[in-house]
């Protein structure tokens, strides 16, 4: 049982980039498909199958509507990791007899970088674009990186660690002018910021259910039909999903993703207003009470549900232990098991000592003002205590440049 504190349930969930709680309306929509409406959507000879197929197609149109796509352009997958792999490897396999170059960004999600590294071993050339200190790519650098051998550019819309929003419209325009396919991992932006695949000239986009208050284990890949984009499937089988992704579709999960997309479509403005208000309240109150706290990533070009802060003079891991009443992360959930400083922060040029102190606070649909205020009070009291104990903080107060210190390795 979670402890209660003035109607506040502890611990407070602030890791919305890692996953989101399922919206009760999503759960309600899914339940019948676990119990009475259990048909296989590919069974065409009876009403159980037809009922499931109708539910799947309705969900497909809800997902498509959220990004301005055609229903036929949505392929259901097990999540964004599979979608990213299918997009990048699928394009590489299909077009590698014509072209052999892919461009991505150093701060992409691990699964995009790993898919690219896998292709490098197969002889595909990969360019990893740098990012500016604000976390955004330079468009001229992208333009100059494209050659006549480039088949694909892959740039995520919202970074999972620092929340910055890349200029997708401009990137899409460059790709279209140069005749290069444009893939975007939109898992952290889908349903949270307006994304239009046609206005942005996106050819492939990866989607995740559990980042938008839907179930885990379901996602989608948008694949453009006009002009047609071809991908070689990773999974062979019964030819479901236009032959791109075989396997029996999980109707309850798809219904959940569809419902989550429908809610996001109708409530995006309300969610954005709520999240922006809490972001500003959190950041302003922290800055009023503590010195040397830095927001990582561009303040304006960002999704405000992500608040990545570095606290000078405090070790990130000890900070997380000190604020154990807040469920937060010191990086991507997929890589935070390793205590290495975040590769995203390092690629922004942030020094090791500040990268090590970074903590990501996530704000979402169900975060309350009371939770934010509790979090701020807790952080401020713990920071003061930790800084009193920190030799690094003492050295900083004395004006010693930590970058010039030679650390001994034991």
Curated annotation (Swiss-Prot):
InterPro entries: Aminotrans_V_dom (IPR000192), Aminotrans_V_PyrdxlP_BS (IPR020578), Cys_deSase_IscS (IPR010240), Cysteine_dSase (IPR016454), PyrdxlP-dep_Trfase (IPR015424), PyrdxlP-dep_Trfase_major (IPR015421), PyrdxlP-dep_Trfase_small (IPR015422). The active site is at residue 334. GO terms for biological process: [2Fe-2S] cluster assembly. It catalyses: (sulfur carrier)-H + L-cysteine = (sulfur carrier)-SH + L-alanine. Its cofactor is pyridoxal 5'-phosphate. [2Fe-2S] cluster binds at residue 334. The modification N6-(pyridoxal phosphate)lysine is found at residue 211. Pathway: Cofactor biosynthesis; iron-sulfur cluster biosynthesis. The keyword Iron-sulfur applies. It is an enzyme of class 2 (transferase). Its main location: cytoplasm. Belongs to the class-V pyridoxal-phosphate-dependent aminotransferase family. NifS/IscS subfamily. NCBIfam families: IscS, PRK02948.1, PRK14012.1. Homodimer. Forms a heterotetramer with IscU, interacts with other sulfur acceptors. This is Cysteine desulfurase IscS. The lineage of its organism: Bacteria, Pseudomonadati, Pseudomonadota, Alphaproteobacteria, Rickettsiales. The gene is iscS.
């Amino acid at each position: 049982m979670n402890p209660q504190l003035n109607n506040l349930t502890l611990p407070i969930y602030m890791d919305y980039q890692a996953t989101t709680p399922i919206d009760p309306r999503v759960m309600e929509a899914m339940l019948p498909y676990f119990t009475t409406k259990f048909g296989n959507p590919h069974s065409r000879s009876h009403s159980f199958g037809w009922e499931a197929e109708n539910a799947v197609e309705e969900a497909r149109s809800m997902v498509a509507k959220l990004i301005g796509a055609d229903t036929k352009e949505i392929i259901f997958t097990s999540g964004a990791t599979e979608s990213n792999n299918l997009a990048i490897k699928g394009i590489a396999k299909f077009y590698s007899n014509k072209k052999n170059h892919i461009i991505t960004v150093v701060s992409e999600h691990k699964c995009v970088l790993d898919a690219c590294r896998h292709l490098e071993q197969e002889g595909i050339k990969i360019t990893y674009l740098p990012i500016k200190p604000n976390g955004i790519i330079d468009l001229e650098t992208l333009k100059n990186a494209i050659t006549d051998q480039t088949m694909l550019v892959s740039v995520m819309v919202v970074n999972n660690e620092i929340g910055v929003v890349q200029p997708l419209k401009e990137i899409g325009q460059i790709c279209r002018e140069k005749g290069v396919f444009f893939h975007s991992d939109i898992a952290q932006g889908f349903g949270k910021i307006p994304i239009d695949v046609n206005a942005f000239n996106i050819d492939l986009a990866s989607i995740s259910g559990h980042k938008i208050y839907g179930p885990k284990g379901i996602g989608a890949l948008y694949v453009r039909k006009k002009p047609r984009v071809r991908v070689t499937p990773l999974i062979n089988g019964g030819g479901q999903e236009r032959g791109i992704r075989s396997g029996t579709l999980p109707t309850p999960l798809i219904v959940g993703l569809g419902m989550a997309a429908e809610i996001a479509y109708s409530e995006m403005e309300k969610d954005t207003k709520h999240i922006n208000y809490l972001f500003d309240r959190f950041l302003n109150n922290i800055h009023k009470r503590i010195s040397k706290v830095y927001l990582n990533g561009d303040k304006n070009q960002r999704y405000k549900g992500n608040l990545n802060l570095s606290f000078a003079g405090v070790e990130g891991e000890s900070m997380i232990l000190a604020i154990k009443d807040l469920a937060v992360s010191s990086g991507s959930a997929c890589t935070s098991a390793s205590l290495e400083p975040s590769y995203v922060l390092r690629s922004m040029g942030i020094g090791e000592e500040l990268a090590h102190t970074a903590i990501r606070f996530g704000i979402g649909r169900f975060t309350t003002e009371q939770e934010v205020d509790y979090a701020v009070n807790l952080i401020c009291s713990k920071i003061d205590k930790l800084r009193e104990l920190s030799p690094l903080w003492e050295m900083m107060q004395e004006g010693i440049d930590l970058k010039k210190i030679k650390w001994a390795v034991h």
